[in-house]
């Protein structure tokens, strides 16, 4: 018996995908379902030899980066994407958010697959303990959670777009860096699958934010624009400290900060706003951009189901005589 109060929707209409109010809902749904993947199909165990070439400090860095990403995916899967559902303008938009929430949980599980393959239980426990104690990681989680739990739908979409299109990228840098040096290439292939999903998520939520702006007056639009840049500055300052804490020891901090600024501009574009950082502050290491590209060594195809590491069994019809040896 339920003892607490639970607010339930008292009436739901059957969703009709043959009648669309916004064609973008079906377009993004088809993209996301066509891109569906699971971490168990990526042979991360093939990375054990190159994992063994990393120093203890490099291994610790990699695990902490992935644990930080796990936290963001957990937030987005269980709170962020779900918080957008009540304010959806169409039932199809609601359905897309449920897909996004599910895939964020798949992403979170992906990092556990990497950990269980490459790391010991003690190392895994240490990494998760670190994630609970790192002030900058917990601070960015707190910032976005405040807006997810607030009562302003458009501000929720801004926070969600910044998480999807900006906050993940201090973590995404490292596997692309290793991949550009022919290390952890199967792990990088999995991360590319995640990045491909996040790119669609950020684009879609930003698009829905722009649709929402049309429904408010000029004063409200100006207020939301100011809010967006203020929130980005707050998150960026915290992200710089987080990046320094992680990457100073390996001398990659300045490169990662360029990658952050590059993706901050992309997040603003998703929201319909102009870039904040000038081009000379966003000149990302070409090796990183190459590792991100669909033509990277792993031959990842961003527009089909998976990268070359992704393994799906093929069904073949057999007859009795095929089993006569």
Swiss-Prot record:
Record GO biological process: deoxyribonucleotide biosynthetic process
Show the SUPFAM superfamilies listed in the entry.
Ferritin-like
- Name any one Pfam family assigned in the record: Ribonuc_red_sm
| Positions contributing to Fe cation 2 binding | 104, 164, 198, 201
- Molecular function via GO: metal ion binding; ribonucleoside-diphosphate reductase activity, thioredoxin disulfide as acceptor
Catalytic residues as annotated in Swiss-Prot or TrEMBL: 111
Keyword Hydrolase on this protein? no
Keyword line: Deoxyribonucleotide synthesis, Iron, Metal-binding, Oxidoreductase
Spell out the GO cellular component terms annotated for this protein, sorted alphabetically and separated by semicolons.
Answer: ribonucleoside-diphosphate reductase complex
Kindly list the cofactors needed.
Fe cation
Protein purpose? Provides the precursors necessary for DNA synthesis. Catalyzes the biosynthesis of deoxyribonucleotides from the corresponding ribonucleotides.
**Which PANTHER family does the record cross-reference, listed alphabetically?**
RIBONUCLEOSIDE-DIPHOSPHATE REDUCTASE SMALL CHAIN (PTHR23409), RIBONUCLEOSIDE-DIPHOSPHATE REDUCTASE SUBUNIT M2 (PTHR23409:SF18)
**Protein's name in the database:** Ribonucleoside-diphosphate reductase subunit beta
Recite the lineage of the species: Bacteria, Bacillati, Actinomycetota, Actinomycetes, Mycobacteriales
Gene it is expressed from: nrdF
């Amino acid at each position: 018996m339920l003892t607490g109060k639970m607010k339930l929707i008292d009436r739901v209409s059957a969703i009709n995908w043959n009648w669309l109010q916004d064609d973008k809902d079906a377009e993004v749904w088809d993209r996301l379902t066509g891109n569906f993947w699971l971490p168990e199909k990526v042979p991360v165990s093939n990375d054990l030899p190159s994992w063994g070439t990393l120093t203890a400090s490099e291994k610790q860095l990699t695990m902490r980066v992935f644990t930080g990403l796990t936290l963001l995916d957990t937030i987005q899967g269980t709170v962020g994407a779900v918080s957008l559902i009540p304010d959806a303008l169409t039932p199809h938009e609601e359905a897309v958010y449920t897909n996004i929430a599910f895939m964020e949980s798949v992403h979170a599980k992906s990092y556990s697959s990497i950990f269980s393959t490459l790391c010991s239980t003690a190392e895994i426990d240490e990494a998760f303990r670190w994630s609970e104690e790192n002030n900058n990681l917990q601070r960015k989680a707190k910032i976005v959670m405040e807006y997810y739990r607030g009562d302003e739908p458009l501000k929720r979409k801004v926070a969600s777009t910044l998480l999807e299109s900006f906050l993940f990228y201090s973590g995404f840098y490292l596997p692309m860096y290793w991949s550009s040096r022919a290390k952890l290439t199967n792990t990088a292939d999995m991360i590319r699958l995640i990045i491909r999903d996040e790119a669609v998520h950020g684009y879609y939520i930003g698009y829905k934010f722009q649709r929402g702006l049309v429904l408010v007056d000029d004063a409200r639009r100006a207020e939301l624009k100011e809010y967006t840049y203020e929130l980005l500055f707050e998150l960026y300052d915290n992200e710089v400290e987080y990046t320094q804490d992680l990457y100073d020891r390996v001398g990659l901090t300045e490169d990662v900060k360029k990658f952050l600024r590059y993706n901050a501009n992309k997040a603003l574009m998703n929201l319909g706003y102009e870039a904040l950082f000038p081009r000379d502050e966003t000149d990302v290491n070409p090796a990183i951009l190459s590792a991100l590209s669909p033509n990277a060594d792993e031959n990842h195809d961003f527009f089909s189901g998976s990268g070359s590491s992704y393994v799906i069994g093929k069904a073949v019809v057999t007859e009795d005589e095929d089993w006569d040896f």
